[in-house]
């Protein structure tokens, strides 16, 4: 009896200590509103289905305001859609690290720029920044133009043949660009690339990583085996690693022999050249080179494909804006067919800029991004967010806030980005590539690539769809996804 009493007393003291150690989190509930949820679960039961997450976030923000605090099980959790608070988070050195939800990326893609913790992230970012400089990006224009010309050839049989799902074609196209600008033009000679199996492998890993992010128990290999997800995932990871390692080893062998590299002259600015040079100097390991190369490809191909497709989809739903874009592009390129787009040409596409910005406002490439506080974070309003809080920055709802963007915030209208409409907006009200200390390293790459692609597609084709804008239903994912993807019809322009 005495032993039982002692054990109960010990458990009670441990429970009191546990509560006391988290007192600052509990005090935060008095300063920041939010759903209380249930004991142990917190608000997790509202977020069990991935299809419901964005809607649940929207309901919480409507009810409690643009910054809320609650719990995901035992984890203190904030949702933020207030531009000023977002700025506080993105510009703070105490909020550089990504949230724990991205643990799956380390396993699937590798430990690199996407998920590295500070200070290692800062070191890698500084070393890799030169690979995304302005002159380097301009050197990729021949690849952008060449690959878009091939895409036009692939689209030709689809014209006037009803509505089609173009996403697989666009993903194959953007994967081709991403691998070539990262590792060289000769990657297209690899068997896995020619057979299109490489795209399937990347898609398999992305799908499994997403499952792991939103179902944390799947981060365990044993649980993935029980769920029947491990074998294909492991095979996909292995084949992609072999593909990347083969390219790296060939590059290193060429450098060692002093032979002329097999890559073309316009490949001199490759990301792979930079990281292999860092390895020779002892700054990077072989695994660093593999991981960073892999992550750059992962980060580039799906988001760019989605951005292009969603823009075409929105223009098909709002044909008046598509016609205005077409007229602008036609003044620069009077003839249909293939043509080379220069950087100077992209600078003339003012209305296409408005369209692309508005497309990424209505459908941001990533709907929600996550950070965590590594030290106490003092917000502009004086509230201190303690160390250890997970923060979800809800880009999707901030981009659609009527308080920020006006009464038609939830519809597509490129006029939102006319100078007189955008000049008074908070600088962090529009963040398709995030912003601040840890912004997307490849945002300029994505914009130039998308503009070249859209210019050629819109000059050659009119895009139509029977799917109404009002029926779009967005699903929370690592990148923005649709529950039902609208099909597009192509009509040849003259």
UniProtKB/Swiss-Prot annotation:
Q: Please name the Gene3D superfamilies in this protein's record.
A: Cytochrome P450
What InterPro entries does the record point to? Cyt_P450, Cyt_P450_E_grp-I, Cyt_P450_sf, Cytochrome_P450_Monoox
Pfam (any one): p450
What's a single GO CC term here?
A: endoplasmic reticulum membrane
UniProt-annotated location(s): Endoplasmic reticulum membrane; Microsome membrane
Keyword terms of this UniProt record: Endoplasmic reticulum, Heme, Iron, Membrane, Metal-binding, Microsome, Monooxygenase, Oxidoreductase
Q: Mainly resides where?
A: endoplasmic reticulum
**Positions that bind heme:** 440
Instruction: Kindly report, in one word, the top-level EC class recorded for this enzyme.
Output: oxidoreductase
What is the protein's membrane topology class?
Peripheral membrane protein
Q: Does the keyword Zinc-finger apply?
A: no
Cofactor(s) demanded? heme
Describe the function of this protein: May be involved in the metabolism of insect hormones and in the breakdown of synthetic insecticides.
Q: So what family is this one in? A: Belongs to the cytochrome P450 family.
Tell me what this protein is called: Probable cytochrome P450 313a4
User: Which species is listed as the source?
Assistant: Drosophila melanogaster (Fruit fly)
